[in-house]
Regions:
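Generic non-transmembrane alpha-helical segments
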Residues: 67, 71-75, 105-114
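Structured, non-catalytic alpha/beta "coupling" segments that mediate domain-domain communication
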Residues: 115-134
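Short secondary-structure capping/junction motifs at helix and strand boundaries
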Residues: 51-52, 77-82, 99, 111-120
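A short, charged helix-loop
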Residues: 140-163
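Residues that scaffold, gate, or flank divalent-cation-dependent active/transport sites
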Residues: 1-84, 88
Length: 168
């Protein structure tokens, strides 16, 4: 968010005392760097691939999270903050087309106001919403928003999802 030069570059963030990898960019994931992996075990991969390494800054993450959550509250009065980077919104009453347009607007607003790219997954349950979000992140065809409402689409999404990737 604060350094556009890092866009599309491999990046990792380390835990307290810089012991383990706590988050990685898509580019760092593609290098095989795993979540929770001890930093010393991947130091060579990091050096070889010019991966940018940052110490964690929880105060900053909390502030950015609060900004995003406040934006979400402007789109739905029913927001359940699940974690520092996840929330569930009730979007009852939307038709499919309106829902897609609304979700794209939410996504665009968060990017414009907070500078953070987000993916949005919509489903009738939290688990289906999480699966939809996973698909929205991984498949560019969704353009960051995946809605699992129709039975065929839900079945297709479930068949594509490994059981160990299912939340809950």
């Amino acid at each position: 968010v604060f350094n556009p030069k890092l866009l599309n570059k491999p990046i990792v963030v380390l835990s307290n005392n810089d012991g383990c990898i706590i988050t990685r960019s898509t580019e760092a994931k593609a290098l095989g760097i795993k979540m929770g992996e001890p930093y010393f075990k991947v130091k060579n991969v990091i050096k070889k691939n010019n991966v940018k390494v940052f110490s964690s800054n929880y105060a900053l993450y909390g502030d950015m999270s609060q900004r995003v959550m406040e934006i979400l509250l402007g789109f739905s009065p029913d927001v359940e903050i699940y974690s520092i980077d996840e929330a569930f919104l009730s979007l009852k009453g939307f038709k499919n087309y309106e829902l897609l347009t609304y979700c794209k607007h939410i996504r665009k607003t968060i990017k414009q106001w907070a500078g953070i790219p987000v993916s949005i997954g919509v489903g009738s349950t939290k688990t289906l919403s999480k699966i939809a979000n996973h698909l929205a992140k991984k498949n560019n065809a969704y353009e960051g928003v995946c809605i699992l409402k129709k039975k065929e689409k839900i079945n297709e999404a479930l068949q594509e999802t490994e059981i160990e990737d299912v939340w809950g």
